[in-house]
Each structure stands twice: as C-alpha cells, then as structure tokens.
C-alpha cells in the first residue's frame, strides 16, 4: 500500500512527479530518510497544504538548522494527511507504542475519512486568524498542542463511532498524558475550532461543540455528578468560552454566546448573550439580557463585559 519517498505510484503524471521532486530536493537533508508515504499527489486546490510548504521553505532558508526536522515533519510528505499522521504518531508514541504503529493507524483513518482533513484545514485557518501568537500554519501544525489534540480527537472519535472503543480510549489517554487535554472520544466537535493554550481542557463524552468555537485553557465541559446518559453541555456555533470556565450538565450555550473567564455555568445561556460569574449571570439580567452583534469566537474579546457588570469591583 505504501511506497518509499522516491517511488511514484502508477497513474501519477510526469508533471506531478517533477513538481514534487523539486520540492523534495530543496529540503532533502544530508542523510537518507526511509519514510513511507501513502498519498502521492499534491492537490492544486489544497491551498492550506501548498501554503504550508511555502512557509516551510521560507523557515528553512532563515534557519537551516531546521532542515532535517522540517523534512521529516512536512516536506517529505505529499499530503496533509500523511504529515498529520506523522506528527501525531511522533507526539503520542512511547516505548511500548511505537510511532510507526500509530502512523499506520492514523493514516488509515485519515484516508478513509476525508471529512477529518477538511476540518483540520478549517482548524488551521481558525488558529491563524484568531490567535495573534500564531505566525504561520506551519507554526500551528508543529507546535500548537491544542490544535494537535483536536486532530487526535477527530481520529479517536471516528474510531469510537466504528466501535473500536479500546483504541479510541487509548488515543484519549495518550493525548491527555502528552498535551494535558482530555477529550472523550465520544464527544462531537465541529470544525474551525481554536483550543487556545489548551492546558487543562476537559470535554466529556456526550458534549457537543459546534463550528467556529474558541475555547481557552482550563475549560471544563463536564457533567454534574455520576449520572449516565446524555449529561454534558451542548455548545452552539460561534461561541467563545473564556479561560477557567466550567460549563456543567446537559445544558445549551446558544449560538454566538460568550462565557466570561472563570464562570461556572449550570443553566442554559441564550444565543448572542454573555454569561459571567460564579454562579454565572447574564449581562443585562435574565429578563432582558444584553445581546451583542459581533461573533465572540472571532473577536476573542474576554473583558468588555466587565464594564457592563454593575457590581464589578476591583
């Protein structure tokens, strides 16, 4: 199924081969790398992947010491799927769970589930647009553990749905140990997700997170006790959840809502409103909550609500 980096599959055009070889030769380190590549064609419309290759070329020009690292992680791969399977397998492997075993598992899931890589691209774009600390797609791809944890969860969730629960839970455990992010493989997570900093994020089994949601570090989407069944929060599209917030129980956070940092939320939050405090209260009051026009997940504004909270004291 797999071929070495220098071997082209039957059906590749000469243009495909020459285009990739040009990129490969530029980045080739001073030693041979025996890697297996599953995808052998760079798609012309894959703007994110092409941009990553361009960024990698620029980075290596600035820092030649990174040539081998970038070659192994980015430029020796002919697809985003292969590069993602590689970086996750390296990050999540240990002495008894070698990276080549994880690579084969991850690449098989990614090849069979193209929707995962589409979500990966949207996540990369989300991080680049919303996090001022992110200087490039490659920077996010190689070093942002929130992004990597989210992609590992997407693979684990696919395995969970296939009733391969033991290996899905194993991935959850390795992500928790490696990234300090604990997302149950049963949780449903949309695309365009930003897990900023990500340390201490916990998402329970029956939680649902919509599209274009931004979640800061130390956030818990948890249950309220030991009851089973549908017991975790449902987060709408475009929501911003501030650092250190706890959202508990089978409640709904409406589309475009904002949860202030450090809040404890145990009741539904209407769409386009702001909840803050412990226990959380709606800005403007329960009867007439103030609604905002901007999309919180994009503005990443975590403090404007403080001036509208009448009893805020410093």
Swiss-Prot record:
Gene source species: Arabidopsis thaliana (Mouse-ear cress)
PANTHER family registered for this protein in UniProt: SERINE ACETYLTRANSFERASE
Key words of the record: Acyltransferase, Amino-acid biosynthesis, Chloroplast, Cytoplasm, Plastid, Transferase
Pathway recorded for this protein: Amino-acid biosynthesis; L-cysteine biosynthesis; L-cysteine from L-serine: step 1/2
Family, as annotated: Belongs to the transferase hexapeptide repeat family.
Quaternary structure and interacting proteins, as annotated: Homomultimer. Interacts with OASA1 and CYP20-3. Component of the cysteine synthase complex (CSC) composed of two OAS-TL dimers and one SAT hexamer.
GO cellular component: chloroplast; cytosol; nucleus
One Gene Ontology molecular-function label: serine O-acetyltransferase activity
Record carries keyword DNA repair: no
Gene from which the chain derives: SAT1
CDD domains: LbH_SAT (cd03354)
Catalysed conversion reaction: L-serine + acetyl-CoA = O-acetyl-L-serine + CoA
Up-regulation conditions: By cadmium (Cd). Not induced under sulfur-deficient conditions. Repressed in trichomes in response to NaCl treatment.
Enzyme class, UniProt record, top EC level: transferase
Protein name: Serine acetyltransferase 1, chloroplastic
Function of the molecule: Serine acetyltransferase which catalyzes the formation of O-acetyl-L-serine from acetyl-CoA and L-serine. Also displays O-acetylserine (thio1)-lyase activity in vitro. May be involved in detoxification process by mediating the production of glutathione.
NCBIfam families found in the cross-reference section: cysE (TIGR01172), EPS_EpsC (NF041874)
Primary subcellular site in the record, as a coarse category: plastid
Annotated tissue distribution: Mostly expressed in leaves. Localized in cortex, trichomes and vascular tissues, particularly in phloem.
Pfam families given in the database record: Hexapep, SATase_N
EC number: 2.3.1.30
Subcellular location: Plastid, Chloroplast; Cytoplasm
Keyword Chloroplast in record: yes
